[in-house]
Amino acid sequence: MSDLVIDTWGLRKWFGPTLAVADLSLSVRAGEIFGFLGPNGAGKTTSIKMLLSLVHPDGGNGRVLGQPLGDRLTRARVGFLPEHFRFHDCLTARELLRFHGRLYGLSGSDLDMRIDRLLARVDLLEAADRPVRGYSKGMLQRTGLAQALLNDPVLVFLDEPTSGLDPLGRLLVRDIISELRDRGTTVFLNSHLLGEVEATCDRVAFVKQGRTIHEMVLGQSVDFIDLEIRVSPLDACLLEGLSAFGSAISQSTADVVRMRVESEATLPALTRWLVERGANVYGLQLRRKSLEEWFVEVMGEDQRPG
């Protein structure tokens, strides 16, 4: 049995003459925290809506939780926090969650316990019986997150979940996502905050002009590490010898050399070699490429997330 909870091939969507999504081909595994990255207008939100069958594709195909797109029973097992949502602002957070719970077929003490647990988890229990018209943007966002988790979903779509949240609110969302991972829940995360994605996700896909153009596993997709060594004496023989341990070797100052190595496992042998040949090693500094740097490299300098 396949462990894929999302599997799509060639999904396309037109809005009039505009091709919003040209080729959405994705595979997301069970229990994965999957980041969906791209510049504004890349088709990310439209892609999510197609996966949720809120928008019907004009081409291609896909399956969610093993069922074709649009399967009604599948929807009951999925949670969704949209980027833009509108609540009935005359209702309290508790009333809103009760309303959404009934849409899922929940009722009675089970629903009440779920509501109390989620309101406490998103730090809204004290404000639960106030109309949401008086809520701040961050409080509304946390209400939306509670709604997305109300049915105890096996797959959750979070579209800009930290929008409007202060640093403590963003930390709370990150903690909740970690808890979902520990429970085996799959999270499909769309966010322009690359630092949050890098701290949270297992794997990411880059989308540009409606196409999936690159995927990478975070923490494993860096095929090299930049290394800066402060060493003396630094001469031509030493520079030549370093080529046995890495590439892209360049001298930046009188006692600093920069190079690329395949992994940290190279460092012990490299350090021993330097010491054995009589060099004085004053410092070794590793630097991995950040997700933002990968984003700019894949997308182009003019396509920073916004």
PLM ranges: what are they?
Residues 15, 28, 191, 233, ...:
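Conserved residues at beta->alpha junctions
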Residues 123, 171, 247-250, 280-285:
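A short linear hydrophobic-aromatic micro-motif
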Residues 173-261:
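ABC transporter nucleotide-binding domain
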Residues 262-306:
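C-terminal coupling/interaction segments
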Residues 20, 70, 196, 234-238, ...:
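Short phosphate-engaging motifs
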Residues 3-8, 13-208, 212-214:
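ABC transporter nucleotide-binding domains
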Residues 67, 127, 137, 230, ...:
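Structured loop/turn residues at secondary-structure junctions
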Residues 74, 237-242, 269-270:
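Hydrophobic side chains in well-ordered alpha-helices
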